């Protein structure tokens, strides 16, 4: 009798689930659907516990340069050999989950966002040794590793341009535009509403997303997931 696979209770990392041979509900058709109908910014809203984070992790594993292609063996998307050849493992990927961006004050929440972005930037430390980046660009990368401890205006500016800057540096290194994945984009806004600093957080997120997703020449496309469809007037104006 064939042994049943374990359920991935508490797991949201696609790579872990596949490598540990947990039971996986194949959602890789999402890759095909995304590439057939993609726009520059793609927003998916679903209820909580609907597998959004796992799907985003799967997208990261599919598109990111250096991916283990064996993770997709036997899954739906592997049948589309032409698509896999063209897109699998071909892009730098920035992946952020904003579900932990919270705080009783705006400053606390902003600090959490700064640390989250800096943590993702640290994944790309190879840029410090890149022959395709000059010293000024490497200094920009060093600044992005730590977004804390700056004066108010300097911090606000660095944070606003952080995702755009790191995508530019990745483009300089790889010669390929970046895919940006932002999971639970609405959590900081929901928490800000609860704690009374919604206007400040809307302004922060609008500025960050505006630079990273709207006026970014180094963006291939972006995927955002959340539970709330925040009004276009507040966040996605002009997208």
Question: What role is predicted for each listed range?
Answer:
Residues 1-239:
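Phosphate-binding site recognition
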